[in-house]
Amino acid sequence: MTVQTSKNPQVDIAEDNAFFPSEYSLSQYTSPVSDLDGVDYPKPYRGKHKILVIAADERYLPTDNGKLFSTGNHPIETLLPLYHLHAAGFEFEVATISGLMTKFEYWAMPHKDEKVMPFFEQHKSLFRNPKKLADVVASLNADSEYAAIFVPGGHGALIGLPESQDVAAALQWAIKNDRFVISLCHGPAAFLALRHGDNPLNGYSICAFPDAADKQTPEIGYMPGHLTWYFGEELKKMGMNIINDDITGRVHKDRKLLTGDSPFAANALGKLAAQEMLAAYAG
């Protein structure tokens, strides 16, 4: 007998009119074990350079009908790339716009994964006690030890990051100082912070979560309503080229901008980022 799971968004009782994804959508798009593999870096980096993670600090995303989507950073999209980078020898720091704790879509956590969960527990304090991004930006110069900026996905990246001057300043610093920028899924929404000023990403190509897919998610109860705007449309307006229109786990490299299309790309993006950064810093 087949058990039918509900496509109705699940109530988040921590906030008025807020919702988690439906049981059905979680059954289709989350797993208790990740697809982490290929973590093989026999000559890891041993230097001082590290990763700056710009994480989400807000949980609730308004939709077109007034309902709130309970979101944050997607755990797979955050932890798998970092797992690879850490195994390759690169430590990381976490910053949020406010300096308040990172918000995760904990309903997508691979809670039975025997590699990812210990890694998360080992680094949980970094996410619970992040730096304030403005303080990091104020300290940036040509000799700063950050080798890359990583913006994880999850719909939480749509909240605050696209309007942040601190995000813009961090990205401008990274591109102008020949550092890597790594992102996937909804994370590239952070690039919109560059649209009202100096935009060094003009003309770059990326993979990202397609707007067309976002428009379909309410049908299965992943979100409780439609988005009020679509980040892909806005990225194209600022001169960026999104090369995918579907979700296949694709990754892409354009100079030192490394991107992936969805959580299905998280492992491949981690491998790509680790390989590229090892070639640049440990070659």
UniProtKB/Swiss-Prot annotation:
It comes from the Bacteria. It is found in: Cytoplasm. It catalyses: methylglyoxal + H2O = (R)-lactate + H(+); N(omega)-(1-hydroxy-2-oxopropyl)-L-arginyl-[protein] + H2O = lactate + L-arginyl-[protein] + H(+); N(6)-(1-hydroxy-2-oxopropyl)-L-lysyl-[protein] + H2O = lactate + L-lysyl-[protein] + H(+); S-(1-hydroxy-2-oxopropyl)-L-cysteinyl-[protein] + H2O = lactate + L-cysteinyl-[protein] + H(+). The glyoxalase activity is inhibited by copper and zinc cations, activated by ferrous cations, and inactivated by thiol-blocking reagents. The aminopeptidase activity is inhibited by iodoacetamide, dithiothreitol, EDTA and 1, 10-phenanthroline. Binding of ATP at high temperatures induces a conformational change that reduces HchA surface hydrophobicity, interferes with its ability to capture substrate proteins and inhibits chaperone activity. Its EC number is 3.1.2.-, 3.5.1.-, 3.5.1.124, 4.2.1.130. The active site is at residue 185. Zn(2+) binds at residues 86, 91, 123. One of its GO terms (molecular function) is glyoxalase III activity. Optimum temperature for glyoxalase activity is around 37 degrees Celsius. Optimum temperature for aminopeptidase activity is around 43 degrees Celsius. Induction: By heat shock. According to some authors, HchA exhibits an exceedingly weak proteolytic activity against bovine serum albumin (BSA) and some peptidase activity against small single amino acids conjugated to a fluorogenic reporter. Another report showed that HchA does not display any significant proteolytic activity but displays a physiologically relevant aminopeptidase activity. Consists of a large A domain and a smaller P domain connected by a linker. The thermally induced motion of the flexible linker-loop region leads to the uncovering of a high-affinity substrate-binding site that is essential to capture nonnative proteins at high temperatures. Belongs to the peptidase C56 family. HchA subfamily. Homodimer. This is Protein/nucleic acid deglycase 1. It comes from Escherichia coli (strain K12). The gene is hchA.
